[in-house]
Swiss-Prot record:
Its EC number is 3.6.5.n1. It comes from Psychrobacter sp. (strain PRwf-1). GO terms for cellular component: plasma membrane. The keyword Hydrolase applies. This is Elongation factor 4. Belongs to the TRAFAC class translation factor GTPase superfamily. Classic translation factor GTPase family. LepA subfamily. Transmembrane segments: none annotated. Residues 5-187 form the tr-type G domain. One of its GO terms (molecular function) is ribosome binding. Keywords: Cell inner membrane, Cell membrane, GTP-binding, Hydrolase, Membrane, Nucleotide-binding, Protein biosynthesis. GO terms for biological process: positive regulation of translation. CDD domains: EF4_II, EF4_III, LepA, lepA_C.
Length: 600
């Protein structure tokens, strides 16, 4: 077993594309954990989607043995963290398991908001943060400017920051030496009762739930009976070890170490991320602080195109949920779309990934309704409701207050694009909280309704700032506002899946835009199709998809006008009858038109 003083637990904090996974690959290669023939790019990103999108979704860990030039052998436990704003809770759990973090910054691009947010989390948790300049071999690097930015924005010394190129391996040996010297060794009593933090859990078809844990106090061996604090369920440990990145059984983990535990747990909710694990014989061990149940922020309806796929869809969601405790779903029915599920996600990226995995891994064809957030409704009798689906809103007559969730947004933007970004935030009904100039960058803090943020705010922010602005947001509070529900009627019938909640001042504009958009997307029928947007019983916008008609007068050459009138009125009668019985097929694009209303 490695002595406590020779263990280093660390994480890498980096913005998307700043080279975190590549640096991890270099560490693995330098320490000889995998043979060269087994190396592939982004070793730790195991899902195809992770590789394709170049993002890390689940936390992974790897234990490396590093021989220091001073002759000592060190055990380095690297815990990989997701970088995207949707997965910030997983980041905080990964960081809580470490004593230090490497802040990897692209030496050409500089500091981004996400790294700042995660870096603050690390500092709050008391971690030693070691800044690293990556991509130093690129021609356009500006290390002096970036060092100044790190000092101005994050407030940590960066003069002696190691300069590396993860791609070519330049400076990686020096970085490993600095890591061992700068990051403190873990503390912990190996004879105390067991206290271990669950960093991540995932499901294996043969082994059940595999938990990645960091042992804080005590030790854990194969054959021990363990207890999960939040569920108070006990399980028998069947396998225990470390990832090197391949699983390697060690039979024991001691204080300060990071590894995996398999105890035949059948359900991912049986080992929630952030929970505390202990021995069944010492159930009153203190909880490790910071554990919270994950709550979805964004809800959307998912419906199979072919209703016979419903059971297959349910199974697919259950399988995904086994591996993703943040995914929530419940059965939902829609008059327009039939049977499906109302699903809750952490954010828009999470939603896209789940949808893509359902379609790719389970061959499902799905229709997605526009996403919405949770609103708080206070009824006149004092009852408070939480509404995640616009079609479930009570009648406006019973509602006393309509409260919407507000997100606190931290935006970092170069000064040149400040005006565009502020205009965008104002358009989204944002209120400015703070603004600080830091070198060439400006840090903005805005309070913006969460419903506006989750729609397409991130994409719009990137486009108005040419990709330079970066965003981090978290839910802050509920606030009363004048909100209304806009219904869409097609030929007088409400289509529940198209309903949306928006601000009273924007309702006419958004209703009008939606109706126009629908007009382009609904194919022409043999009869007129009226598309209307309404608030309650008041119609606020209307548009008509004109009928296709056959030229019934083609065979009348000349002849009496009454003959023509007769043929036309006969056609008119037929269309009228058809309209009474005809139903309109609504294509998938039309359901997503709600999303594109703001993109004009």
């Amino acid at each position: 077993m490695t002595a406590l003083s020779n263990i280093r637990n660390f994480s890498i904090i980096a913005h998307i594309d700043h080279g975190k996974s590549t640096l991890a690959d270099r560490f693995i290669q330098t320490c000889g954990a995998l043979q060269d023939r087994e190396m592939q790019a982004q070793v730790l990103d195991s899902m195809d989607i992770e590789r394709e999108r170049g993002i890390t979704i689940k936390a992974q860990s790897v234990t490396l043995y590093y021989d220091h030039p001073n002759g000592e052998r060190y055990q380095l436990n690297f815990i990989d963290t997701p970088g995207h704003v949707d997965f910030s809770y997983e980041v905080s759990r990964s960081l809580a398991a470490c004593e230090g973090a490497l802040l990897v910054v692209d030496a050409a691009q500089g500091v981004e908001a996400q790294s700042v947010a995660n870096c603050y989390t690390a500092v709050d948790l008391g971690l030693e943060v070691l800044p690293v300049l990556n991509k130093i071999d690129l021609p356009q690097v500006e290390p002096e400017r970036v060092i100044q930015e790190i000092e101005d924005i994050i407030g940590i010394e960066a003069d002696d920051a190691p300069r590396v190129s993860a791609k070519s391996g330049l400076g990686v040996d020096e970085l490993l030496e600095a890591l061992v010297e700068r990051i403190p060794a873990p503390t912990g009593d190996r004879d105390a009762p067991l206290q271990a933090l669950i960093i991540d859990s995932w499901f294996d078809n043969y082994l059940g739930v595999v938990s990645l844990v960091r042992v804080r106090q005590g030790s854990l061996s194969k054959g021990d009976k363990i207890l999960i604090k939040s569920t108070m369920d006990s399980h028998l440990v069947t396998s225990i070890g470390v990832f090197t990145p391949k699983p390697l059984e060690t039979g024991k983990l001691e204080a300060g170490e990071v590894g995996f535990v398999i105890a035949g747990i059948k359900d991912i909710h049986g080992a929630p991320v952030g929970d505390t694990m202990t021995h069944a014989k010492t159930p009153d061990v203190d909880l490790i602080p910071g554990f919270k149940q994950i709550t979805p922020q964004v809800y959307a309806g998912l419906f199979p195109v072919d209703s016979s796929d419903f059971e297959k869809f349910r199974e697919a969601l259950q399988k995904l949920q086994i591996n993703d405790s943040a995914l929530f779903f419940e059965p939902d029915t829609s008059d327009a779309l039939g049977f499906g599920f109302r699903c809750g996600f952490l954010g828009m990226l999470h939603m896209e990934i789940i949808q893509e995995r359902l379609e790719r891994e389970y061959n499902l064809d799905l229709i997605t309704t526009a996403p919405s957030v949770i609103y708080e409704i206070k009824k006149k009798n004092g009852e408070i409701l939480l509404i995640d689906n616009p079609s479930r809103l009570p009648d406006p007559g019973f509602v006393e207050e309509f409260r919407e969730p507000i997100a606190r947004c931290h935006i970092l933007v170069p000064q040149d694009y400040l005006g565009n970004v502020m205009t965008l935030c104002m358009e989204r009904r944002g209120t400015q909280v703070d603004m600080r100039f830091m070198g060439k960058q400006v840090q903005l803090i805005f309070d913006i309704p969460l419903g506006e943020v989750v729609m397409d705010f991130f994409d719009r922010l990137k486009s108005v700032s040419r990709g330079f602005a970066s965003l981090d947001y978290e839910f802050d509070r509920y606030e009363v506002d004048k909100l209304v529900k806009v219904d869409v009627l097609i030929n007088g019938d409400k289509v529940d899946a198209l309903a949306m909640i928006c601000h009273q001042e924007q309702a006419r504009y958004r209703g009008g835009q939606l109706v126009e958009k629908m007009k382009e997307l609904i194919p022409r029928q043999m009869f007129d199709v009226a598309i209307q947007a309404a608030i309650g019983s008041q119609i606020i916008a209307r548009s008509t998809v004109k009928a296709m008609r056959k030229d019934v007068l083609a065979k009348c050459y000349g002849g009496d006008v009454s003959r023509k009138k007769k043929l036309l009125s006969k056609q008119k009668e037929g269309k009228k009858r058809m309209k009474q019985v005809g139903s309109v097929e609504i294509p998938q694009e039309a359901f997503l038109a709600v999303l594109q209303v703001d993109n004009q």
